[in-house]
Amino acid sequence: MEVRHNWTVAEVQTLMDKPFMDLIFEAQLVHRKYQQANHVQVSTLLSIKTGACPEDCKYCPQSAHYRTDVDRERLMEVESVLDAAKKAKNSGSTRFCMGAAWKNPKERDMPYLLDMIKGVKEMGLETCMTLGMITADQAGELSEAGLDYYNHNLDTSPEFYGNIITTRTYQDRLDTLSHVRDAGMKICSGGIIGMGESASDRAGLFVELANLPQHPESVPVNMLVKVKGTPLEDAEDVDPFDFIRLIAVARIMMPESAVRLSAGRESMNEQMQALCFMAGANSVFYGCKLLTTPNPDEDTDMQLFKKLGVNSEQVAQKPDQIQEHELLDRVAERVAARPNKDDLFYEASV
């Protein structure tokens, strides 16, 4: 299969409607052709500036437009961010992502952001930031400081977008991605499933991503985390099989990209996550929180990787060079000793 940039919505919908087993099989074949089998890349995400965002994204608990339990916090001190990065590296992450709840970064904040990037890079970690919209000049500054990835999601299809966000346009998002690419950085861009969009909208999101001049190097696929106080707190649950199908579709359409299981993974049981990996997911966020929403902790992830025979880069980069099977056995023993460990997941397949 060739790498394409000319997908149509109708074509993607036909792909989505394939028999489940056929679709997963096709995705796994593509995955093994373009990606390393049985391998998952792990990243850590830190909120470096939380809450009071002026945007009105209906899914987001950090928006100043909604009453949620998220407290407003100033931009973190550089040293505090670097301390968190050290902990992430020691826990096994190979990429450190920093997110700020802004419409766009102010010029007064740029020196601090650049110092964060440089400090994290010195630790040998890949760096990623998500700061909202950025100008071409800001993209150049971030790139010069050593930023590897910039995250800016498209969220949904152009047609459904206005139902979710009104404070920035779809073109604003595409312009930011262009600035990132022109500055020589890698793109991390995906969307959110479960906001009330149609199957056609889901297909449209992936068409937008796959038809970019160059595919995003990383494609996070989020399942909506419903937060009390946001307009989407009562949204319908996403059918697990529909979500797994979308992972497969992303893998087939963007074979060279990393497909990341992102928000919503806390509500997926082990079987659902395993099927997502089979469908082509090969990256996860690692740690107990994604910005302000829950995420499976590191030990739980390592136990699942052991069950599946999945390798993560984090094992090979442990400072003491512990053999992978020894590390996984120790983690599994710790997790097995916990009470009510099965309560970490609800039965998402029902």
UniProtKB/Swiss-Prot annotation:
Which enzyme type, at the first EC level?
transferase
EC number(s) on file: 2.8.1.6
Instruction: Extract the signal peptide range.
Output: none
Q: Which Pfam families match?
A: BATS, Radical_SAM
Pathway(s) annotated for this protein in UniProt: Cofactor biosynthesis; biotin biosynthesis; biotin from 7,8-diaminononanoate: step 2/2
Q: Which GO terms describe its biological process?
A: biotin biosynthetic process
What does the record give as the reaction this protein catalyses? (4R,5S)-dethiobiotin + (sulfur carrier)-SH + 2 reduced [2Fe-2S]-[ferredoxin] + 2 S-adenosyl-L-methionine = (sulfur carrier)-H + biotin + 2 5'-deoxyadenosine + 2 L-methionine + 2 oxidized [2Fe-2S]-[ferredoxin]
Q: Which residues bind [2Fe-2S] cluster?
A: 97, 128, 188, 260
Any one GO MF term held by the record is: 2 iron, 2 sulfur cluster binding
What does the note accompanying the cofactor annotation read? Binds 1 [4Fe-4S] cluster. The cluster is coordinated with 3 cysteines and an exchangeable S-adenosyl-L-methionine. Binds 1 [2Fe-2S] cluster. The cluster is coordinated with 3 cysteines and 1 arginine.
Superkingdom of the organism of origin: Bacteria
Cofactor names: [4Fe-4S] cluster; [2Fe-2S] cluster
Q: Which UniProt keywords apply?
A: 2Fe-2S, 4Fe-4S, Biotin biosynthesis, Iron, Iron-sulfur, Metal-binding, S-adenosyl-L-methionine, Transferase
Q: Which of this chain's residues are annotated to bind [4Fe-4S] cluster? A: 53, 57, 60
The residue ranges of the Radical SAM core domain are 38-256
Q: Which PANTHER family match?
A: BIOTIN SYNTHASE, BIOTIN SYNTHASE, MITOCHONDRIAL
Q: How is the quaternary structure described?
A: Homodimer.
Q: Into which family does the record put it? A: Belongs to the radical SAM superfamily. Biotin synthase family.
Role noted for this protein: Catalyzes the conversion of dethiobiotin (DTB) to biotin by the insertion of a sulfur atom into dethiobiotin via a radical-based mechanism.
NCBIfam families xrefs = bioB (TIGR00433)
Its protein name is Biotin synthase
Annotated gene: bioB
